[in-house]
């Protein structure tokens, strides 16, 4: 006779810690923005935090084209390639991203080591940002 009790099973699949870390990082940014938007964090200027983060960390094709043309790569602009995945246009946008990170990240993390998952995540983000910069018409 088996001692397996189906009522004690978790309804969720176990998630690798690196995937949980990425999802919590995205959720943390979004929670901070939501609290600021509601006036519960950061004072009156917090209402504009999302727009400020988008302006500071979004991938701007004209900016990257100009950097390419001049051969100048300021670190504060290169940071955009790995920072933009943590800033989203809205709460709904962030939720969709978190769901996909949890689902797809679990599959990737089952095959790769934690450090490799981070390389895939940030590498894909950087490559996607550069491709976007040079494919989008000016």
Language model features with spans:
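C-terminal transmembrane module of polytopic alpha-helical membrane proteins
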Residues: 1-40
């Amino acid at each position: 006779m088996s001692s397996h009790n189906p009522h004690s099973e978790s309804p969720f699949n176990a998630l690798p810690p690196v995937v949980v870390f990425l999802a919590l990082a995205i959720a943390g940014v979004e929670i901070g923005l939501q609290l600021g938007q509601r006036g519960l964090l950061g004072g009156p200027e917090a209402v504009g935090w999302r727009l400020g983060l988008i302006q500071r960390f979004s991938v701007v094709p004209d900016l990257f084209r100009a950097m390419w043309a001049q051969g100048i790569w300021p670190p504060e602009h290169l940071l955009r390639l790995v920072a933009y995945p943590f800033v989203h246009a809205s709460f709904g946008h962030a939720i969709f991203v978190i769901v996909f990170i949890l689902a797809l990240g679990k599959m990737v993390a089952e095959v790769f080591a934690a450090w490799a998952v981070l390389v895939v995540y940030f590498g894909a983000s950087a490559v996607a940002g550069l491709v976007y910069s040079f494919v989008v018409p000016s």
